[in-house]
């Protein structure tokens, strides 16, 4: 580490204010931080890094935080159920910004081959510890680390507490910051913001009792700093689905399930991955009779009535929860049955006009699934982190490290090098990764 400093909005650029947490935000109060890592191939010297790149990143982040000020906030966590949690911005609030240098092998880090994720954690920051006061706790929700790989490239690691942002909101921020950085020397850099974020919680129409219910439930559990422990028993591997492979996969599924006329790339890949992962596990016959669950995030912004603005910044996620008997999932028809179940569950969820009427059942339903055999996905087929160009072109590699803290999970985003392709990353114990890699290498004919 070369330096740790603070970066905030410029003085007097943001009014002191508070933003309440909705029940959508409170869902994540006890969840570990989201950890994103972007590697950029940009050979530069230490001098150019310290005299040009770092100042530009700081200046552009400062200007971006004017528009995304909740990232600079403290989250206020009262001790009493009578007071609600909120993001509070006071003049001078800022985020932790770490500058580091590494002699690690850059080319090795950006490869898709299996590797231990442990060393990747050297390049993401930790959120500052929780501050305890007599009647409340305070904690910061965002931190940045920039790492130089001399002569090879730059890494940007980000830790975000999930209460402040879901994946669509994070993508809006990273797109805005990278664009601001790329155009920082232009006088009209503000024009690079496609649309400014909306923080007004009243744009989501729901019974306010949900906030009280979720808050009282959150207070039942101790608030702890939750940086994921180092996943020493894990292997991470990235699997790329090119457009032609996706087309072949969809055709294979549709040939066996003709009713799936409008089969999405997401459903096809999700079914293939879910069946493959489950087959990779050894299980006794009793477990084969149990249900297996697949937890899929669903962005509710366009699906509520009235719709929530696309540029709403915060959390606005529900979920789909397909379930199958494990023995069916690992059987010969596993992928086809999984595609049917996933497609039906997502369709039911996104077309449910009364989805918010079931909010009180969400947490118990998810907790039940987490006690069983479950698989989850972070990201989506629309997520394009590679598009975040700070002036050095597309990222060479992106990693969502948060899945290392999950039992069995995958990340999904647009592929870097293949138009229409998608990239899946898995984090698994080595024996299970070896079994899945064998399944994947067989292809859809295996």
UniProtKB/Swiss-Prot annotation:
Residues of the active site are: 162, 389
**UniProt KW keywords:** Acyltransferase, Transferase
Q: Does the keyword Transmembrane helix apply?
A: no
Found, by tissue, as follows: Detected in the young leaves of perilla red forma.
Q: Name one GO molecular function term.
A: anthocyanidin 3-O-glucoside 6''-O-acyltransferase activity
Pathway listed for it? Pigment biosynthesis; anthocyanin biosynthesis
* Any Pfam family matching the protein: Transferase
The record's annotation in SUPFAM superfamilies points to:
CoA-dependent acyltransferases
EC number(s) on record?
A: 2.3.1.215
Reactions mediated catalytically: an anthocyanidin 3-O-beta-D-glucoside + (E)-4-coumaroyl-CoA = an anthocyanidin 3-O-[6-O-(4-hydroxycinnamoyl)-beta-D-glucoside] + CoA + H(+)
For this entry, list what GO says about its biological process. Answer: anthocyanin-containing compound biosynthetic process
Give the similarity note: Belongs to the plant acyltransferase family.
**Functional note:** Catalyzes the transfer of the p-coumaric and caffeic acids from their CoA esters to the 3-glucosyl moiety of a range of anthocyanidin 3-O-glucosides, 3,5-di-O-glucosides and cyanidin 3-rutinoside. Anthocyanins are ubiquitous colored pigments that are responsible for petal color. Does not act on delphinidin 3,3',7-tri-O-glucoside. Recombinant enzyme can use caffeoyl-CoA but not malonyl-CoA as alternative acyl donor.
Name assigned to this protein: Anthocyanidin 3-O-glucoside 6''-O-acyltransferase
